[in-house]
């Protein structure tokens, strides 16, 4: 037999450390040379999250901003938060964030506005120093918003707004809406004109460009053609000599590739990802920034400071309180993200905790591994729950466990299909254990 048993198990600790998220291990010489030196995130919950149906009162908006600041801490992971400036409640939330930022909060508030002179005037009065400018770039938009003027009229309007922003000392972020259905020729021409316009302004006002996968149809592959290839769009913009921090990706999740597209963009040299924590947003949502963070941490970004991902749980609680919580099976922070229902998996957890743990979830996310007691969880699932709840080391064959399991089996035999909650099981356990073991 050619299979030989090693003296010690191989757990690949350099890839799966017990105190960090899984790491990206590059073979020698294979780390992508286009990876940016630094990557950071732009949070758009106050804009796209709200636009997608998140019900934000002024108080809720303030609390979200504060939680986002708690998540990023001094890591610089999240540097921008994007706001609407139009309604009173949105302006008041924006002003609150601006005041907090001036007092030292780590996230700089920016805005999303239409490429109109009056909108630029509005944010100048508020005191914003960077803004996104809606610059629809596909013919699906230009030919139907500007009629016969099409691309020419659209470009003229965008450039006028860019110039006005620069004149007011506001850094423009050109949002190339619907990039993944846009003509590369038009995008090249528009970017070239924007950069030419900005030449006479100082470095801190040089524009950023947001690649918008507005309908989530972008692909993370560089061997497919434009306009759908996200890496090729990033490469096109890098070709203008733009730094990674001048290029931003804003993807949607309509075809399930939102995180893959973020990672593909970063690999190609994009330095900023726009999304929302917990993935809220228009239609199927934006890039879930906590997921992007996990991958970037695995690549070694922000290694000098702690990203406080367990603080995302505060956002989960807040959203649940306004009826907009994540689904139970939402990765990382859903109620059931680390809950198994299969007895064979529960048996693995009992034997070796790491067998069915992708990483140290309690440490890194503040979420416990658990087992739901169902008809499929069996004795192994019950053992896991009892040992966790009672602080014991019970084993299979314990008659007290058998008594509780028999009660559960009667539930399934009677046609029950829902999980058994601890509140139901506790009196059964107390009776079986006669309370002297300290059931609690």
UniProtKB/Swiss-Prot annotation:
GO terms for biological process: antibiotic biosynthetic process. Can also use magnesium, calcium and iron ions with lower efficiency. Pathway: Secondary metabolite biosynthesis; bialaphos biosynthesis. Its EC number is 2.3.3.18. One of its GO terms (molecular function) is transferase activity. Optimum temperature is 30 degrees Celsius. Optimum pH is 8. Keywords: Antibiotic biosynthesis, Cobalt, Manganese, Transferase. It catalyses: 3-(hydrohydroxyphosphoryl)pyruvate + acetyl-CoA + H2O = phosphinomethylmalate + CoA + H(+). Its cofactor is Mn(2+); Co(2+). InterPro entries: Aldolase_TIM, PYR_CT. Pfam families: HMGL-like. Residues 39-313 form the Pyruvate carboxyltransferase domain. The keyword tRNA processing does not apply. Strongly inhibited by p-chloromercuribenzoate (pCMB), iodoacetamide (IA) and EDTA. Belongs to the alpha-IPM synthase/homocitrate synthase family. Homodimer. PANTHER family: HOMOCITRATE SYNTHASE (PTHR42880), ISOPROPYLMALATE_HOMOCITRATE_CITRAMALATE SYNTHASE FAMILY PROTEIN (PTHR42880:SF1). Involved in the biosynthesis of phosphinothricin tripeptide (PTT), also known as bialaphos (BA), a natural-product antibiotic and potent herbicide. Catalyzes the condensation berween phosphinopyruvic acid (PPA), an analog of oxalacetic acid, and acetyl-CoA to form R-2-phosphinomethylmalic acid (PMM). Can also act on oxaloacetate, but shows no activity when acetyl-CoA is substituted by propionyl-CoA or butyryl-CoA. This is 2-phosphinomethylmalate synthase. It comes from Streptomyces hygroscopicus. The lineage of its organism: Bacteria, Bacillati, Actinomycetota, Actinomycetes, Kitasatosporales. The gene is Pmms.
């Amino acid at each position: 037999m050619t299979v030989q048993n090693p003296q010690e198990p191989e757990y690949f600790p350099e890839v799966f450390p017990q105190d960090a998220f899984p790491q990206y291990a590059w073979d020698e010489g294979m780390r992508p040379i286009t990876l940016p030196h630094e990557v950071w995130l732009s949070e758009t919950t106050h804009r796209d999250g709200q636009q997608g149906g998140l019900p934000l009162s002024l108080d809720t908006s303030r609390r979200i901003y504060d939680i986002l600041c708690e998540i990023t801490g001094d890591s610089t992971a999240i540097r921008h938060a994007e706001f609407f400036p139009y309604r009173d409640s949105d302006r008041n939330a924006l002003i609150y964030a601006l005041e907090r930022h001036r007092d030292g909060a780590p996230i700089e508030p920016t805005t999303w506005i239409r490429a109109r002179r009056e909108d630029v005037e509005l944010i100048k009065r508020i005191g914003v120093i960077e803004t996104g400018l809606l610059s629809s770039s596909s013919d699906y938009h230009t030919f139907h918003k500007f009629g016969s003027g099409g691309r020419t009229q659209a470009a003229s309007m965008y450039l006028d707004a860019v110039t006005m922003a620069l004149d007011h000392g506001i850094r423009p972020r050109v949002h190339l809406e619907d990039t993944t259905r846009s003509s590369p020729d038009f995008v090249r021409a528009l970017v070239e004109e924007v950069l030419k316009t900005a030449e006479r302004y100082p470095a801190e006002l040089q524009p950023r460009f947001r690649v918008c996968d507005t309908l989530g149809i972008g692909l993370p592959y560089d061997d497919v053609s434009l306009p759908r290839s996200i890496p090729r769009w990033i490469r096109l913009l890098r070709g203008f000599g733009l730094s990674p921090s001048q290029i931003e990706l804003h993807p949607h999740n309509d075809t399930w590739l939102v995180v893959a597209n973020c990672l593909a963009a970063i690999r190609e040299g994009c330095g900023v990802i726009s999304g929302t924590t917990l993935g809220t947003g228009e239609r199927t949502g934006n890039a879930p920034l906590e997921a992007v963070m996990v991958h970037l941490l695995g690549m070694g970004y922000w290694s000098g400071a702690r990203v406080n991902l367990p603080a995302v749980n505060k956002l989960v609680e807040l959203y649940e309180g306004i009826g907009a919580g994540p689904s139970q099976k939402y990765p990382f922070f859903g109620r059931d993200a680390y809950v198994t229902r299969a007895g064979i998996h529960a048996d693995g957890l009992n034997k070796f905790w790491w067998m069915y743990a992708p990483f140290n979830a309690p440490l890194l996310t503040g979420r416990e591994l658990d087992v739901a007691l169902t008809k499929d969880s069996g004795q192994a699932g019950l053992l896991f729950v009892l040992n966790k709840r009672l602080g014991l080391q019970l084993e299979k064959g314990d008659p007290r466990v058998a008594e509780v399991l028999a009660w559960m089996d009667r539930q399934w035999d009677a046609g029950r299909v829902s999980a058994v909650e601890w509140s139901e099981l506790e009196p059964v356990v107390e009776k079986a254990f006669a309370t002297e073991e300290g059931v609690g």
